[in-house]
Amino acid sequence: MKKIASVLALFVALLFGLLACSKGSSSGASGKLKVVTTNSILADITKNIAGDKIELHSIVPVGKDPHEYEPLPEDVKKTSQADLIFYNGINLETGGNAWFTKLVKNANKVENKDYFAVSEGVDVIYLEGQNQAGKEDPHAWLNLENGILYAKNIAKQLIAKDPKNKDFYEKNLAAYTEKLSKLDQKAKQAFKNIPEDKKMIVTSEGCFKYFSKAYGVPSAYIWEINTEEEGTPEQIKTLVEKLRQTKVPALFVESSVDERPMKTVAKDTNIPIYAKIFTDSIAKEGEKGDSYYSMMKWNLDKIAEGLSQ
């Protein structure tokens, strides 16, 4: 019944969006490109490149999980009107309930013409769990080098759709990627100084594989990806037994997940939760971590601090 209601809501909202489209051109009265991103991280990267040259709508709200989402009528309307749509790809919005696949199909949008995966060119890491083996791990942005790649892919499509602002986009891209690159180099140096027997990042979801590869910090987790069961007794037991064989000084919990399973791990191992960190979303505006750059800086700083205890 819930699924039927969701489909009906999507259909009605799409009709409303198409009717709204018929009242004007897709670029709107402002003449600016209408751009849609699937989540707050992609929205922030896009804003850093496009500035005020576009009208931007981000679908999944700040703090919400982009793996499985039910688009609202406004999301359907904005998607149907969009000149350009950016999504992460590699099993994020297209895994789980495949909400993005349904959304663009119903909006009659065409891949690599209307919507683009910003992860194109990423060296993909694959999941390993019993029910997930062989599927792509979507969390590529947690390696800053991939964040730079995302920015370049976004700029490429903005320029293709809006060539008159090419110089503006390229200038912003250069400044932004230089900023990200400096943070990346700083992080690589910081993690070199942590003793090997303390060097492990422990989180609820196993979303730090790209981070681990980039910064040389092994990872452990309760569950592998948010589209599977989360925080079962067996998952918790497995992690607790693993941690008892280590000298890991700190645990971390993501801002967009239920923290109760990690609290159980902390209690059973006597290892404290050092900080909340960001994975699938930036923070609310005005809070620490409210941009891609600041969320990554927060993560890198807090993880290095916690593992240095």
UniProtKB/Swiss-Prot annotation:
Entry keyword annotation includes Cytoplasm: no
Domain of life: Bacteria
UniProt: a divalent metal cation binding residues: 67, 139, 205, 280
Subcellular location per the Swiss-Prot or TrEMBL entry: Cell membrane
GO-annotated biological processes: cell adhesion; metal ion transport
GO cellular component: plasma membrane
Molecular function terms, GO-annotated: metal ion binding
CDD domains hit by this protein: PsaA
Signal peptide: 1-20
Residues lipid-modified (S-diacylglycerol cysteine): 21
Protein name: Metal ABC transporter substrate-binding lipoprotein FimA
Organism: Streptococcus parasanguinis
Lineage, broadest ranks: Bacteria, Bacillati, Bacillota, Bacilli, Lactobacillales
